[in-house]
């Protein structure tokens, strides 16, 4: 029900019931160049059950042999823009048909300048075993020039409760030299990236806004945090997503370069969010909303799940100029996944989409009652 991404891999062998195909085809109104099969299978799913036979029934030669980290950005590559527009149109029509479409503008009101916080912003860095990159990330965070006070949370996670490669000691050393660093090491062995965010967000030292910085990435320049906070006050939103530049570890630009996620529009972004595989970076949050909803305690898709839940009721703001460098290197967690791990990740996000789809249908029914 929630497998709405247009790159869902059904495999090369698909059997269709003729009468169901004919019925679905009669409801097709658009002549797509790229979204034809996607539109068809969405319409099939509106009236029929799609069944996966979990047995080996055939073999084929894989033609796309790129690593998962290379395929990850296909949907935001500018050369694929027109096909993505078609996919969005097909998905939006499907959401309207099943009662999950959310009309633009129906948001809960926000006043992000209300209330008192110890600092205006907190930079969030979950970390585990990033001795090669954590100093770059922390230096980037500490070098921000702002008109307000901010701090930097570094939250360790993983089965050992802390890093085992020297990261913990390096962060401790940097924290002794700069009191803005809030280094959290717990005795929890179940803590994932999402749980690390929750721990920092509920800490009384957390600021009005919480801004993402992954432990192997860096901000584009010293003005990133100021731009984020200014945008929150200008747009009065619960979540803010920026644009980023794809680079290697040495900050050399990699194709497709700037990822601006222009598929997000104020009118239809939260509907299209159910189709795409990610919302963008860096992600920042108004802390009271983050504390209200929280992230799932996982190491994958936790930010996507939170973004979907926020977008159901609150406005998500955007910055389309690159303010963040997403570094691709040999130790990216999603750089070269096995087929089994990639499938596991996709199933998790599809489950998030299913739950969100059901929540939106329920919301619309309640509003119509």
Show where each model-derived region lies:
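Conserved donor NDP-sugar-binding/catalytic core segment of glycosyltransferases
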Residues: 1, 223-256
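A recurrent flexible, glycine/aromatic-enriched loop bordering the glycosyltransferase active site
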Residues: 2-15, 262-284
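Acidic donor-binding loop at a coil-to-helix junction in glycosyltransferase catalytic cores
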Residues: 31-40, 299-306
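Catalytic beta-strand/loop signature of glycosyltransferases that borders the donor
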Residues: 51-57, 63, 243, 317-323, ...
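Short, acidic, metal-binding catalytic loop of nucleotide-sugar glycosyltransferases
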Residues: 139-149
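A conserved acidic beta->alpha catalytic loop
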Residues: 156-170
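Glycine-rich, basic loop-to-helix element that forms the pyrophosphate-binding segment
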Residues: 187-205
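Short beta-strand-to-loop acidic/aromatic patch adjacent to the donor-nucleotide binding site
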Residues: 207-218
